[in-house]
Amino acid sequence: MIEPLLCGIVLGLIPITLAGLFMAAYLQYRRGNQLGA
């Protein structure tokens, strides 16, 4: 049995984590692009 609270926390953290990773990769890509140009 998984507690609804725990399930809600996990479901809430997953999109935030994915968004954070995507933002970090995007910023790093932009920074590398500017340095290359």
Swiss-Prot record:
Record-annotated membrane-spanning stretches: 5-25
Keyword Transport tagged: yes
Topology of the protein relative to the lipid bilayer: Single-pass membrane protein
Gene Ontology biological process terms, A to Z: cytochrome complex assembly; photosynthesis
Pfam families tied to this protein: PetG
Keyword line: Electron transport, Membrane, Photosynthesis, Thylakoid, Transmembrane, Transmembrane helix, Transport
GO cellular component: cytochrome b6f complex; plasma membrane-derived thylakoid membrane
Location relative to the cell: Cellular thylakoid membrane
Predominant location category: membrane
Subunit structure: The 4 large subunits of the cytochrome b6-f complex are cytochrome b6, subunit IV (17 kDa polypeptide, PetD), cytochrome f and the Rieske protein, while the 4 small subunits are PetG, PetL, PetM and PetN. The complex functions as a dimer.
Family according to the record: Belongs to the PetG family.
Function: Component of the cytochrome b6-f complex, which mediates electron transfer between photosystem II (PSII) and photosystem I (PSI), cyclic electron flow around PSI, and state transitions. PetG is required for either the stability or assembly of the cytochrome b6-f complex.
Protein name: Cytochrome b6-f complex subunit 5
Source organism of this protein record: Synechococcus elongatus (strain ATCC 33912 / PCC 7942 / FACHB-805)
UniProt lineage: Bacteria, Bacillati, Cyanobacteriota, Cyanophyceae, Synechococcales
